[in-house]
Regions:
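Conserved beta-strand-loop surface patch within small alpha/beta domains used
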Residues: 1-59, 67-103
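Cys-dependent condensing catalytic cores that perform Claisen condensation/acyl-transfer
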Residues: 62
Length: 103
């Protein structure tokens, strides 16, 4: 298991039942605050956290959790394409990872 995933799982468990959100920066997990109006259904990374991540190094991927175990959504796929970054989605109840690649 990639090291960042251990930290991301811990963050997802701490944030449950809300979606956790973070970034992979230089191979390490960078937790971010989810400022979505409905954080149990989706996520929006706090722009201050995103800026701090950019200053810390190269943003390599977006990470977020699905607290209810729902599969990767069409919205996730579309957002992944828009960011042009790899996305990792962690299903909390299933303890399973999904990866989305930008196309």
């Amino acid at each position: 298991v990639q090291d960042f995933k251990r930290e991301a799982v811990r963050h997802a468990e701490e944030e449950h039942p809300k979606e956790s959100a973070g970034l992979v920066v230089n191979g390490s997990y960078f937790p971010c605050r989810n400022i979505a109006p409905d954080p149990e259904a989706n996520f929006v990374i706090n722009p201050v956290d995103y800026a701090r991540a950019m200053l810390a190094g190269t943003i390599e991927a977006v990470v977020h959790s699905h607290p209810q175990g729902t599969p990767v959504s069409d919205h996730d796929r579309k957002a992944c394409r828009q960011t042009k970054l790899l996305w990792y989605v962690y299903s909390v109840p299933d303890k399973q990872w999904s990866t989305i690649k930008p196309s």
